[in-house]
Amino acid sequence: LKNGTTYNSFIIRGEKTALVDTSHEKFRQQYMDTLTGEIDPKDIDYLIISHTEPDHSGLVKDVLALAPQAIVVGAKVAIQFLENLIHQPFERLVVKNGDKLDLGNGHVIEFVSAPNLHWPDTIFSYDSKTQVLFTCDAFGMHYCSDSTYDDDLAAIEEDYHFYYECLMGPNARSVLSAMKRMAELGEIGTVATGHGPLLRYNVVGLTGR
């Protein structure tokens, strides 16, 4: 990875709070320090798991140790996988395509089933208030810089296409199916991916390719 990568995790704050994804266990200390610097884990109401690949779910057990009240949200298969990964009881909410979770203050999260992108249990999460679509690995890239967003298209374009061809291209039919479901959502202002900068300035150009 000549330009590095990032492991992205997100906090959605409404009347209730959701944490979207965790990180890889090899970054345990850095992640947990960052998370607890941003929020008291006792305030996390929901832990949304986009899929159970280790770089997104590797610290679920650690988060639940500090936030035992959190309800884990995921596809049916994801919840089943997690049971075998963390070996402990946990509160859960199984969601399917079109299901919604109201966090309050206008933050209604709608879930999009996106299997095989590139894990069998993948879901996207769409926040209708902020128009942010959390897509896990889809539309991501292995690229790391000081920029949070895709404000330098020329710098990221090569890595974006390479990532797509390696991870998403083999599942092109699944990509098209997910995009059809995405089209049923409201306007998408930002694509918050699991790796690399978030797409804000080139959403149409990059997700349409």
Regions found by a protein language model. Give the residues of each.
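Conserved beta-strand hairpin/beta-sheet module of binuclear metal-dependent hydrolase folds
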Residues: L1-G37, F124-D127, Q131-T135
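Active-site metal-binding motif and surrounding structural segment of the metallo-beta-lactamase
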Residues: E15, K26-V73
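Active-site neighborhood of phospho(di)ester-bond hydrolases with catalytic His/Asp-centered motifs
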Residues: V20-T22, I44-T52, V72-A75, L133-C136, ...
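Short, glycine/acidic-enriched loop or turn micro-motifs at the edges of active sites
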Residues: H24-E25, P54, G140, L198
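Metallo-beta-lactamase
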Residues: G74-Y201
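Long, charged amphipathic helices and adjacent flexible linkers at domain junctions
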Residues: V203-R209
